[in-house]
Amino acid sequence: MRLFGGKNNKFKVDPPKIRIEKVVVDRPAQKPKPKPNPALSGSASRSSSSHHPSPKPLARQASHSPYPSSCDEKRLERKRKAPSVSRKSPASDRIEFDKDSDGEDDGWMTLDTKRQRKGTEDSGFVDPNRKLRSVRAFEERMDSRKFIHAVDVASLEHKCVPVMGAQKDEVAIRLQYPSLQPREKYELVWGKDKIDAVEASIKVVRHVAETYLTEEEAEPFTNPNGGIIRRLEKASNRNIQDLMGFKAALREYNEKLRALVDDGVIAKNLDKMHELPQHLVAFILDQIYDRTVALKVELLSKYENGTDYVYGELLHPFISKVLVEQTRMTSGQVFVDLGSGVGNVVLQAALEIGCESWGCEMMENACNLAEEQKKEFDARCMLWGVRPGKVHLERGDFRKNAPIHEALKRADVVLVNNKAFTSQLNDDLVRMFLDLKSGCKVVSLKSFVAEKSNNHNINDVGSTILEVEECIYPEGYVSWTNAGGSYFISTRK
């Protein structure tokens, strides 16, 4: 293409003047964990916010399963072991390139539920045009075979063992979600690298009470003295192990929630909401990952260093920081992920922002897993009663993909995890950015603008069409290292 080189190059510019603004992202210090106090373990504190119909989240409890559990710290640690190493827990099965301590993303799950995607305190930003409720989820029931039940991946058939002293014919339970959809099947069992049914069911109950109900409606669930959550935690305590008590509390939860759904309470509350708490977004995405990618994560190890086929993930907190706080995306906008892997970021943008979300990937195994995730994503959103943005997943080379090129013309935010891209591919991307509309943001791990003038004409084009800002991400934001690093937000001039 003579446009970018040779005598006919029409881009004649002065040496690029690059504005670099370093933005330090402060990571909230973790609060020290209080010493266990059985009398207070179920207590709840209420938020003073008034825009949501939901109470402030309860303090998180550790799993009381008598066996080692896939605790939050391991579930949220995205610096995953390579497939050749034994896996920690379902949601922990991410590709890892070094060994670091657990729990680096723990603060991600302890964010205040009532905080407007963190923007309430920082910027007051809310997207009033987002319609969060899925009408279909409250009008029709999907076939229970449309989604992957927990029992399909963690059961007696999968060599798991019963917990709480249950006999084999006592392990089956079902869990109601905040919609008309079928209840999910679980078994009260434990197995290495398997879904912990005790922990998972308590978390679902807690998320429903915190997000979908007003304080008054949530009282039967959150009351520290005999509320359903308190009873579930007490019954599953390793020193008590009350199987019948646990199942009775879960049955009561199912009945009360279904009554609230049938009475239109859940739908009414969702209609007043315009966003989901970040920790619920992460929980739903992890449910999807656990039932799809985690089962076949070894397929992602087939990459080659020094090529454009290296696999790595940007984690939930990173994406929330960029899409919610920095670029302030809204549900009416368009997001494009170039090199979308298994689709994690595409799905997060659609769920957390509600925007039209595009992704393109050329690695076959990653594409196949992305399709599996999308199918489960659609079903899980129905279970939770929420309507995400439209998701489009494309296969192949994004440089040659016509739908992606059309989407780029409308894009408001483009993400390129180009940390391991070859220089040729990065150069080709700059050419593609000529079609971006003015004001479009390009988020990347490497800058597309050279720091110093050189003879590489493509960098002259980058400085001509992009204004770049350098930012710093803290530790625990990417899958391939625990260390922090730089990323760039470029704006199309």
UniProtKB/Swiss-Prot annotation:
Gene Ontology terms for molecular function: histone binding; histone H3K79 trimethyltransferase activity
Catalytic activity: L-lysyl(79)-[histone H3] + 3 S-adenosyl-L-methionine = N(6),N(6),N(6)-trimethyl-L-lysyl(79)-[histone H3] + 3 S-adenosyl-L-homocysteine + 3 H(+)
Keywords recorded for this protein, A-Z: Chromatin regulator, Methyltransferase, Nucleus, Repeat, S-adenosyl-L-methionine, Transcription, Transcription regulation, Transferase
Region of interest (Disordered), ranges: 1-127
Any one GO biological process: subtelomeric heterochromatin formation
EC number(s) from the headed UniProt entry: 2.1.1.360
Alphabetized Gene3D superfamilies for the sequence: 1.10.260.170, Vaccinia Virus protein VP39
Compartments, record wording: Nucleus
DOT1 domain location: 182-493
InterPro entries: Dot1 (IPR021162), DOT1_dom (IPR025789), H3-K79_meTrfase (IPR030445), SAM-dependent_MTases_sf (IPR029063)
Transcription keyword on record: yes
Pfam families in UniProt: DOT1 (PF08123)
Residue ranges of coiled coil: none
GO cellular component, one term: chromosome, telomeric region
Family: Belongs to the class I-like SAM-binding methyltransferase superfamily. DOT1 family.
Additional observations: In contrast to other lysine histone methyltransferases, it does not contain a SET domain, suggesting the existence of another mechanism for methylation of lysine residues of histones.
Entries under PANTHER family matching the protein: HISTONE H3 METHYLTRANSFERASE, HISTONE-LYSINE N-METHYLTRANSFERASE, H3 LYSINE-79 SPECIFIC
UniProt name for this protein: Histone-lysine N-methyltransferase, H3 lysine-79 specific
Gene for this chain: DOT1
